[in-house]
Amino acid sequence: APVQGRMVFDGSNVALAVGPTLFAAEVFYLSNNAGPSQLAGAQCNPYFFGTAWQNDDYHEAAGKFASERNFRKVAVLAPNYPAGQDAINGFKRGYAKPVASETFTKLGQLDYAAELAKLRAEAPDALYIFLPGGMGINFIKQFVGAGLSKSTQIVGPGFSADEDVIRAVGEPMLGMFNTAHWNHDFANAASQAF
């Protein structure tokens, strides 16, 4: 969408698609959200500025958290697009052991019956998800509704457990762990001052 004579793009898949054209034309791309790992590595470009985060950072922190909590059998689940792939790779980098299983879903998927059946059969002690927005809302409701939260601890990034998701899901969010950089109700001096 045009904003004061500029174009605004969002999403890792979009950043990777339009980036080369913009870079070839020596046009700066300022990303307020997407930070595909490719643009921080092999495809790093002086015309790309990520003002938020690199995609895999939150997920790497979650992997480290899962290691510290000593989860022994962890399954991971994310949509099959660049940010989802970065999520799983970041988690695996932070987690000290190999993951039990990796599942990539369709981007925008809302029905997780097949994935829940697979999880029930695998019986992991923890599940890491990257399912932002409606995907996360539906998955968490279905996960808890299927009774899987009684035996499997769910862990996710802030994108899968932000205020909007919590508001939409409600009580089934209780007990979920998430990694995020900030929330308005963090009880520490820096957050309260902000």
For the regions a protein language model found, what residue spans apply to each?
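Extracytoplasmic "Venus flytrap"/periplasmic binding protein-like
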Residues: A1-V8, S12-S31, G41-Q43, E122, ...
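Short low-complexity, flexible loop/linker segments enriched in glycine and/or proline
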Residues: T21-F23, C44-Y47, L116-A117, E171
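Ligand-binding clamshell of periplasmic/extracellular solute-binding protein-like
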Residues: R6-A17, N32-L39, I129-I137, G156-D164
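Extracellular/periplasmic periplasmic-binding protein-like sensory domains
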Residues: Q142-F194
